[in-house]
Amino acid sequence: MKKLLLTLTMLALLGFLSACAWLEEPEIDYRAAMIEAAVHAEEAAGREAADLRNAVLDAQGSAEARIDFDELLLLSRALTLRAGEARLTDELRLCAGEVLLNRVASPEFPDTLREVLAEEGGYEGLDGVRPDRRSAETAWELLAGKRLLDRRVLYQSDGKPSGPVYATFCDRYYRYTYFCLTEHPELYEETLG
């Protein structure tokens, strides 16, 4: 009887362990992990999450955008510095970040976000900025491909417009922000469409 009871217990345990082995691993929310790492300036954790996410996307053959953690952190910091005020809308924050990414893609500006920010001049001390959550989430959306503006919008001004105005925002304190087009549209004619 003891042998039978022991055998049945072992079979039940073996069945339980086999069932556990077939359970799927829970999906990891790499987006949340990377945003959390950006907000807390945990660069090693953020890079690891980005590498894992991008490896999963590669293994799946996904067309989803690969997001570099260093770009996410840098853009998050720039958005916090330039558009991190709580009173600003998410839409305005998206547009501010989009101007920076449009510049990276433009033949009129340097080819990397860090170089664009260095040239801009208004981003001194950027590496010491701790991103806020809204800015990190906005940076993620932008790096994932979300766009609101024409890609020829290369300027943002809180004062007098610096070129042909594409969009105007007014915050609740009646401060206007203008998003302006390049003064060299001919550089973009071939690739528009």
Identify the residue ranges that each predicted region occupies.
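N-terminal secretory targeting signals
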Residues: 1-67, 183-193
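Bacterial extracytoplasmic/cell-wall-associated proteins, especially those involved in peptidoglycan
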Residues: 54-193
